[in-house]
């Protein structure tokens, strides 16, 4: 760092700085202004895109929930074309529709697509929980257990424990199921879920 003896030295240093860097500063200012304009345009474009995606998502899922003709293919098209949170949410809605129709393979595929479309950890956790539940129904217990292993965070511990118990029980591992449910009961769990897991533990003894 340069040390100055008096105010004149500081003034001279400033003069030298602008003499040596004036052109670079001017270019920097121009680039900075250009970048600012570019950023504002990009930001405005992003807001408009998000607004359009939100509206299209609402229209798609509303049509699906109302059972309108061709609403499922239209929602599938929306989910496939929107590699973002809205696409992932559409995949969740579609997966539920497929589960209701007992088209479990389609539901699993739609959930896996949704996972690839979002970076939001909470949404990923929800999708993985749904996927694990579908995998248990498909008798894919090992796949369900692997899916559950990807879900992190204390807030999900009880629900994960409940599903883990179901997956293990479907494999005939009663002790593993008991351990999972006992861990779930001891976690930060709602009274209703705790009571349900305790009931499952009690049923193992019957």
Swiss-Prot record:
Changing residue 11 to D: Decreases degradation by FtsH. Changing residue 8 to A: Decreases degradation by FtsH. GO terms for cellular component: plasma membrane. Changing residue 5 to A: Destabilizes the protein, which is prone to degradation in early or late exponential phase. It is found in: Cell inner membrane. Disulfide bonds: none annotated. The chain crosses the membrane at residues 24-43. The first 14 N-terminal residues form the YfgM degron, which directs the protein to FtsH for proteolysis. This is Ancillary SecYEG translocon subunit. It comes from Escherichia coli (strain K12).
